[in-house]
């Protein structure tokens, strides 16, 4: 007969190790979703990734107002970003991305999930892949992309000049669209 604390886990196709670690984190947390999230995620991140709890967000916006986020992350690379998104999905933690914080108002009550910011050097990389292709990180500033492209003879980036923000933000907000 089952006791109140007994649990049964059925695993189908997929990554058994990931599910086993998630289940173990959940068991250790005694039902605390955020503790389970942290227990699962922390060992999967590189040392240079930032993961903070109850992080004030006002200083991360140009307006300088707003509350805290339950979780805040600055992943060092794409593998860490993938681990963060995976953990959010596994533990039902809502997530949101921010860029440089321009034109962003954070509610005073904050955000109960995880805020991700692509801030480190990995995300700011701009490099040529071929003679007519650039590889650009989502955190690269538009003015720096424009300058880099112009200095190396790339065409078609001129419209970025004068648009504030990063590539990720520009794509999200459809920057430069006319009408």
PLM feature spans:
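ATP-dependent small-molecule kinase catalytic core of the GHMP/sugar-kinase superfamily
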Residues: 170-179
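ATP-dependent carboxylate-amine ligase
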Residues: 1-35
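Anion-binding (especially nucleotide phosphate/pyrophosphate-binding) glycine-rich loop
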Residues: 38-167, 171
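Thr-Gly-centered strand-to-loop micro-motif
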Residues: 10-11, 136, 174
